[in-house]
Amino acid sequence: MKNLNLLSILLFASIAFVSCDNSANQNQFTLLSSNDTGVDFTNQLNEDNEINYFTYPYIYMGGGVSVGDINNDDLDDIFFTGNMTKNRLYLNKGNLKFDDITDSSDSGGDDRWYTGSTMIDIN
């Protein structure tokens, strides 16, 4: 019985070792510039004596992002929330090209601190 357990462990270790292969080291993602995509959002944080980690510990929690189809064209649109910058809504035009429709959709928000986002498609 002891030999069977040892044999099982050796067999499992051999299979795990043989199945590891680094020869197919291919990139799964490609970095695209904002000039190519039209998505240019930065959640810029500016700390000072009034707003910093010690006075507001949630400062580094970040904003939020939602992805959904807002105009029923079967393309995923992107909504970013900002902490110290206005929110941004990007309409997907296809082929990873987006238009900033924040102003025309009145989705920039106000001076509040936005930290999350959700999106739902009812229809």
Spans of features found by a protein language model:
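Bacterial N-terminal signal peptides that target proteins for export
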Residues: 1-8
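Acidic, glycine/proline-rich Ca2+-coordinating loop motifs
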Residues: 1, 20-123
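Bacterial N-terminal signal peptides
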Residues: 8-16
